[in-house]
């Protein structure tokens, strides 16, 4: 399912962005 793959990748990107912001704050 292409749409599901894109959605999953987008969610993973969001998680990585949040983690990156957290590490920047440290």
UniProtKB/Swiss-Prot annotation:
Q: Cellular component terms, GO, for this chain's entry?
A: extracellular region
- Tissues in which the protein is found: Hemolymph.
State where it is primarily located: secreted
**Entry keyword annotation includes Calcium:** no
**Where does the record say this protein resides?**
Secreted, Extracellular space
Q: Which keywords appear in this protein's UniProt record, sorted alphabetically?
A: Copper, Oxygen transport, Secreted, Transport
**MF annotations from Gene Ontology:** oxygen carrier activity
**Coiled coil (UniProt feature):** none
Which superkingdom heads the taxonomic lineage of this protein's source? Eukaryota
Protein role: Hemocyanins are copper-containing oxygen carriers occurring freely dissolved in the hemolymph of many mollusks and arthropods.
Family to which this protein belongs: Belongs to the tyrosinase family. Hemocyanin subfamily.
Q: What is this protein called?
A: Hemocyanin subunit 5
Give the organism, scientific name. Answer: Maja squinado
